[in-house]
């Protein structure tokens, strides 16, 4: 196992993801993690991440110096390398020419960490400081146009001024793999087949004959959690799907068919009437979210009570992923409250369940791979993200049954055309937004005054930032024609060309 000490870099999670993609199990902890906890994890190597600070600043992040007594290889990346240089007596200063973006790395000295790596390659830089003098015993391995010491080595200690974890670094994955396999002696034992076998055995032992309640939203995470649990405990899983009437077209039927194929019993609650009555007259987005969240809890509680009376439920399953775990203990210090799934946050006190989070070690892409391993269809696993409050936050203004129907039909056409054109898997997320704006139109010889709808499609890697998708005009024209001809009540279609920032992906 490789352990990454996080100094606050926006790229830290990528380090773990790249190594895991190579089959090497990797965890992330904050830079201030105690030596005792690090020793318990027994890592074969440490990686010190990048970070936004300068090592010579008074408030610079610095780990416990005893990490050097652990006798394991250490790799410092960007800030991590500068920390190593500073700690061992070298000199780091503010750079006259800062490096951001792509640069050419030139290897000047053979090293195990560069085995099989091209002499010259593109790497990704993101630093304002640079090393001008190495500590005693260190050797320069590579340089870039503005960094004379772009890679350094002293025995089992290595430093890289660039970011090998970023996809723009052409040989970055190979360099990280060399560190883990050739320097640290790790083995490629991490993969979803192994994880599934291990986790099913662990869940069987932990849960035994107890019952587990699992809220199923129809999304990837909750579906994979339910599938994994069912493999472990069979009918002791109580999977509950609440249909709040704000789902995509045919969503309920699709989820039911999926669970039938997986042979997992699913308790479906038709709560459309309850949700729509509570949303009547409400147009403020945050209030809509609040009402949906509270109503979900009411409906979920009622269903849970029903099952609780039949036989005590001991566990509540949640689709927490590894990024949620990392965020709960960030470099800014431990968080008091671990981020909860929107569907189960704020449950009443009588539901004194033990929490079970089978996916808490996994990134989103790994959860998808696990789902594939467990037999969940690829088509289902690769669906675009969908907000917890559903179509309520894609209908601007008050929600009504007729507006939901209108939006469902338009959205269905947009997604169907994206799939026909082989574009669905090329955009990160696509959907329609029903605007609370009417416009004048002409249908035949008649004047119309109907809804306008907005198409939204974005490209992103994680949703933190996004750019609008450049869809061909002919494609947009086809979608527009279909929507205005096939969906009653819509006479105008617009396309959103706002990126994030300044906009958000969803409108509400």
Curated annotation (Swiss-Prot):
Pathway: Purine metabolism; GMP biosynthesis; GMP from XMP (L-Gln route): step 1/1. It catalyses: XMP + L-glutamine + ATP + H2O = GMP + L-glutamate + AMP + diphosphate + 2 H(+). Transmembrane segments: none annotated. PANTHER family: GMP SYNTHASE [GLUTAMINE-HYDROLYZING], GMP SYNTHASE-RELATED. Residues 190-383 form the GMPS ATP-PPase domain. Keywords: ATP-binding, Glutamine amidotransferase, GMP biosynthesis, Ligase, Nucleotide-binding, Purine biosynthesis. The active site is at residues 78, 163, 165. Homodimer. The gene is guaA. It is an enzyme of class 6 (ligase). GO terms for cellular component: cytosol. Residues 1-189 form the Glutamine amidotransferase type-1 domain. ATP binds at residues 217-223. Pfam families: GATase, GMP_synt_C, NAD_synthase. GO terms for molecular function: ATP binding; GMP synthase activity. This is GMP synthase [glutamine-hydrolyzing]. The lineage of its organism: Bacteria, Pseudomonadati, Campylobacterota, Epsilonproteobacteria, Campylobacterales. It comes from the Bacteria. Its EC number is 6.3.5.2. Catalyzes the synthesis of GMP from XMP. NCBIfam families: guaA_Cterm, guaA_Nterm, PRK00074.1. PROSITE patterns: GATASE_TYPE_1, GMPS_ATP_PPASE.
């Amino acid at each position: 196992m490789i352990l990454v000490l996080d100094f606050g870099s926006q790229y830290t999670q990528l380090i773990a993801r790249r190594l895991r993609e190579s089959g090497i199990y990797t965890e992330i902890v904050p830079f201030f993690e105690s030596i005792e906890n690090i020793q318990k994890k027994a890592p074969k190597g440490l990686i010190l991440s990048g970070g936004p600070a300068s090592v010579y600043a008074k408030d610079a992040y610095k780990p416990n110096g005893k990490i050097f007594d652990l006798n394991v290889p250490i790799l410092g990346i960007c800030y991590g390398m500068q920390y190593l240089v500073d700690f061992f007596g070298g000199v780091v200063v503010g750079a006259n020419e800062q490096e951001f973006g792509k640069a050419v790395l030139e290897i000047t000295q053979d090293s195990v960490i560069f085995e099989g790596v091209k002499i010259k390659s593109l790497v990704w830089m993101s630093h304002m400081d640079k090393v001008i003098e190495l500590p005693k015993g260190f050797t320069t391995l590579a340089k870039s146009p503005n960094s004379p010491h772009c890679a350094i080595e002293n025995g089992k200690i290595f430093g890289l001024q660039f970011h090998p974890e970023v996809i723009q670094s052409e040989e970055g994955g190979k360099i990280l793999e060399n560190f883990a396999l050739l320097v640290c002696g790790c083995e490629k034992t991490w993969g979803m087949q192994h994880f599934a076998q291990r986790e099913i055995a662990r869940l069987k032992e932990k849960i035994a004959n107890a019952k587990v309640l699992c809220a199923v939203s129809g999304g990837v995470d909750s579906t994979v959690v339910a599938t994994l649990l069912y493999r472990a405990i069979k009918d002791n899983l109580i999977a509950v799907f609440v249909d709040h009437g704000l789902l995509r077209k045919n969503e309920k039927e699709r989820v039911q068919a999926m669970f039938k194929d997986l042979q997992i019993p699913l308790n479906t609650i038709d709560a459309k009437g309850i949700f729509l009555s509570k949303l009547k007259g409400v147009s403020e987005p945050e209030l809509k979210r609040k009402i949906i969240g509270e109503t979900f809890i009411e409906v979920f509680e009622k269903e849970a009570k029903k099952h609780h009376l039949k036989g005590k439920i001991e566990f509540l399953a949640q689709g927490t992923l590894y990024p949620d775990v990392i965020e709960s203990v960030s470099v800014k210090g431990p968080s008091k409250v671990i981020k909860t799934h929107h569907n189960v946050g704020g449950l009443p006190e009588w539901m004194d369940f033990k929490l079970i989070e089978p996916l808490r070690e996994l990134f989103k892409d790994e959860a998808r791979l696990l789902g594939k391993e467990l037999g969940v269809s690829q088509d289902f696993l690769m669906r675009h993200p969908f907000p917890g409050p559903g179509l309520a936050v894609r209908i601007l203004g008050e929600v009504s049954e007729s507006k939901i129907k209108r939006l469902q039909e338009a959205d269905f056409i947009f997604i169907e055309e994206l799939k026909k054109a082989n574009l669905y898997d090329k955009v990160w997320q696509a959907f329609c937004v029903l605007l609370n704006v009417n416009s004048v139109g002409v249908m035949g010889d008649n004047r119309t005054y109907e809804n306008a709808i907005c198409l939204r499609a974005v490209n992103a890697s994680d949703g933190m930032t996004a750019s609008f998708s450049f869809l061909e005009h002919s494609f947009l024209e086809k979608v527009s024609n279909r929507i205005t001809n096939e969906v009653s009540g819509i006479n105008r279609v617009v396309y959103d060309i706002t990126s994030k920032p300044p906009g958000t992906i969803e409108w509400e």
